[in-house]
Amino acid sequence: MAKIAVVTGAGSGIGRASALALLNSGYKVALAGRRKDALDETAKMAGNNTPNAMAVPTDVTKRDDIVALFAKVKATWGRLDLVFNNAGGGAPPVPLEELPYETWLSVVAANLTGPFLCTQEAMKIMKDQSPRGGRIINNGSISAHAPRPFSVAYTSTKHAITGLTKSTSLDGRQYDIACGQIDIGNAVTPMTERMTKGVLQPNGTTMAEPRMDVKAVADAIVYMDSLPLDANVQFMTVMATKMPFVGRG
C-alpha cells in the first residue's frame, strides 16, 4: 500500500524536489503551496507518477487553509503517513532594531505558526488511524544553529522549530508518531540564488557561498521516512561541504 504524504511549499525549491522524490518512491503526495500553477507544474514533473500527486492550494499562514488541506487528504486517501513541514520564508536583512513589527509577525506566521498548525492537524489524523502513527519532518535550516547577520526573525523562528520538533517527538511517542528535523545549508533553489553573487558575512565582508544539489536534501527526506516508526532521525544536517557554517558567527 502506498504511503500518504503532505509536503508544504511544494511549488518550488526544496519542497518541489522532496515531493518529486517521494512520488518517485511510490508515495501519494498532497502538494501544498500558495500558487496552484506552481503545484500543477510540480505534479507534471512527476511524469508517470503524476496521478499520485494532488495539488492543494494552501497558505500556511491561514488556519482555515491548513484545516482544509488535512481534511482533503483524509477524505481522499483515508490516512496520513508523512508530513514535511517545509514552507516558510525570510525577511530582508536589516538591523534588529529596525525590523518592522509587521515583518516579524509575517515571518513567525509562516515559519512557526504554520508548521505548528500542520503538526496539530497531522497528529489528529495519525493518532486515530489504523495502523496508528506516522512521521513529521520539520525543515529547521542551518539557521536553527547559527545566525546570519541581520536575520533575527528567520533565525528566531528556526530555533523555535527545534523546540517544536522536540515537543512533537515527546508528545507523539504514545501514538507512534515520530518527529525529526532536517537542517539544510545552501541547497540550490531560487531562494539561495543570491548566494552566488555574495552574501553578508559576520565580519562585515560580502562573499559568494558554495551550494549543493537540492537532490541531496530530497534523498535525505526519503531516507528519514524509510525507517520504521520505532526508529527516528531526530536531527540531520545536510549542507554544502564548503559553506561557511562551522565557525560562523
Across the structure, where does each feature detected by a protein language model lie?
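Residue(s) in the substrate-gating loop at a strand-loop-helix junction
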Residues: S141
